[in-house]
């Protein structure tokens, strides 16, 4: 047996699963991505197991032995997941399809995922030549009907190619244009998950361009005659900037950390910025993309702000930028942070020196809504003698503005500032 597979099946969790299956007297196989990644010597936190008749209780038995959490994914079809506590690893269990493991593997998307290792004999099962395709670094559909069975596999083909740095086999590529229109029938959240996983990779541009030339992105967003080169060019400029943030000077690391944050599960700000660049280049409104991809409210809002950032008239350079003007500008564009500078910088709309000034303000001075202030709401109620309500919120906003513009720098200054505002405001904070 290949030493990489031997290392995989000898690890504690696979070894336990295989032992339970052997003692239970039923067939079970490690399949798909975990076998592929083992052969590629790539780390993997997810294990997929196909279970033969009689092994229905295997997921619960595994969960009990490792102290993991059991989750039924589809009780009717017998799909279940076991999650290891504190390790981020999971095992997905599914019943055998088609009566034999060879028939089960033939129903899968690509040959590199149609690989299995038997829990009973530790043998590699490779009926479709997936190991050879791994060696040749190609993505090949398991059958001519693979895309008709699930059109999402078209997007997955490009995502796997980008993730593994593989090429899509010519015969598989030839199937894509005729099947791409079927993507209109695929649920938006399924497309979203695959698309954002690809966009979050550091070198997604060539694969997005190939998708566009094959009619895939046009089918996803309902855009005929999508300008593939223009859209890919816009994406390339932003992707390059996301890799090399030196244009942000001393703020590069805070910006990098910001781009890694998720705006909703599975969607980083970096990937959303790259999508915004592509949409602008393709002439696709952010609202249409948000609706098609079933984005949540926060991601929808941020995508709209990112798309509009390349059309915004940014403040002209000044020796001493007005902090009040900056506070007003960025308040109206919350929750966007430094990421909103990336598209205009990439398009040459925002000069690099001005970008650094704005990034410094956003990272060092501007306090977003909900950010930490010098005084809490309770502090303000005690200081001003206010009951809970609207006036406390108004006082918080006054303090946020004062801190963001540099008028207030210490707790004592904050107390004096609000006390003075209470005395001088035409409508007192009462």
From Swiss-Prot:
Binding-site residues, Mg(2+): 46, 48
Binding annotation for CTP: 33-36, 108-109, 113, 150-159, 190
Alphabetic keyword roster: Magnesium, Metal-binding, Nucleotide-binding, Nucleotidyltransferase, RNA-binding, Transferase, tRNA processing, tRNA-binding
CDD domains (UniProt xref): NT_ClassII-CCAase
Family recorded in the similarity comment: Belongs to the tRNA nucleotidyltransferase/poly(A) polymerase family.
GO molecular-function terms, A-Z: CC tRNA cytidylyltransferase activity; CCACCA tRNA nucleotidyltransferase activity; metal ion binding; nucleotide binding; tRNA binding
Main enzyme class: transferase
Name under which the protein is recorded: CC-adding tRNA nucleotidyltransferase
Known EC number: 2.7.7.-
Stored Pfam families: PolyA_pol, PolyA_pol_RNAbd
Cited Gene3D superfamilies: Beta Polymerase, domain 2, cca-adding enzyme, domain 2
GO biological process annotation, one example: tRNA surveillance
Annotated InterPro entries: NT_sf, PolA_pol_head_dom, PolyA_RNA-bd, tRNA_CCA-adding_enzyme
